[in-house]
A protein has these predicted regions:
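Helicase motor interdomain insertion/brace
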Residues: 1-10, 14-16, 20-175
């Protein structure tokens, strides 16, 4: 950002910057980071802190949970031509989570995931600090889940969580 600002000839005082992240453990470092990133003076930044709202019911997923998430091909989900086709891809997972038909993609996924222990664990752990994706399987699923199954389950969980919404105008369940 600093180089772009310089190349465009924008003086620091004309640049407004909003940096957001829950992954900084030290708010003062966040100010320094924003200043370095933008080329602005650290005194131009104000830190705003809040409390994390953790999702209830966080728990490690079982082998059955991982298998249900691993049972569909994410490429098929993304390549589906319509929401109805996407629902066919994830039908088994929705049934596993006991979401009753008729289904609508976003709200049905929200119902399936809002109280799903691994989803709550994913949200809670990733909002505190950045997490290496390749370590999430061991954090989100019990030890008896094979690593490759857990990895695919995490990938599918992240994808579904970003689509899951109560209403189309709301953000996804996975922030």
């Amino acid at each position: 950002i600093r180089r772009l600002r310089t190349r465009l000839g924008i003086p620091p005082e004309r640049l407004q910057v909003i940096c957001t992240s829950a992954s900084f453990k030290d708010a003062d470092y966040a100010v320094e980071f924003g200043a370095q990133l933008s080329g602005k003076d650290p005194t131009d930044f104000r830190k705003v802190q809040g409390d994390l709202l953790e999702r209830p019911g966080a728990a490690k997923g079982t082998a059955a949970d991982a298998a249900a998430l691993d049972a569909f091909d994410l490429n098929d989900f993304y390549e589906a031509a319509s929401d109805a086709d996407r629902l066919k891809v994830i039908e088994g997972f929705l049934k596993y989570r006991k979401v009753t038909a008729p289904w609508e993609l976003q709200p049905s996924l929200y119902k399936a995931l809002e109280s799903f222990g691994p989803m709550s664990s994913l949200v809670n752990s990733t909002m505190k600090e950045a997490q290496p994706v390749d370590e999430l399987g061991a954090k989100l699923f019990e030890a008896d889940v094979p690593a490759e199954v857990a990895a695919r389950a995490v990938t599918n969980l992240i994808a579904l969580g970003s689509v899951a919404r109560r209403e189309p105008t709301e953000p996804g369940l996975l922030p």
